[in-house]
Amino acid sequence: MLPHQNSSYTRQGTNDAQANDMRSPSQLPTSVNIEDPSKLCISSEKLNTPMHNRSRSGIKKHTSVKRSRSFKLFDTLFFGILRLRKQRIRSVKKVRSISSPVLISTTSALALATIEQQPVIGECS
């Protein structure tokens, strides 16, 4: 624990009983010595503060991986198609005008063509 954090933990020391109310009695701390910060019981609620969620640059960890625009577009199209397929399978089966593999291949070819901005030539095998 860093020395400049001691004051915040000693201030929150009185709230330990309130923070640990949801725990089972075996997990409750028996005694907390506020003078010695190494013996403080740090609950999971305190560990989930935004200070711990952020990296050193101040950006959240899960936003550090950036994807390109075209990949996001393809991703949303692809998973949208999968979601539509699931909904169609769950619904009452009707007469299929187009079989699902052909539908998937043509839509993926169209999606790739719109991403690359090239015309679709021929059929996607």
Swiss-Prot record:
Composition bias, Polar residues: 1-33
Pull one GO CC term from this UniProt entry.
Answer: nuclear envelope
Which residues lie in Basic residues bias regions?
53-63
- According to the lineage, what is the superkingdom? Eukaryota
Where are the stretches annotated Disordered?
A: 1-35, 44-63
Know the name of this protein? Uncharacterized protein C25B2.08
Specify the species.
Schizosaccharomyces pombe (strain 972 / ATCC 24843)
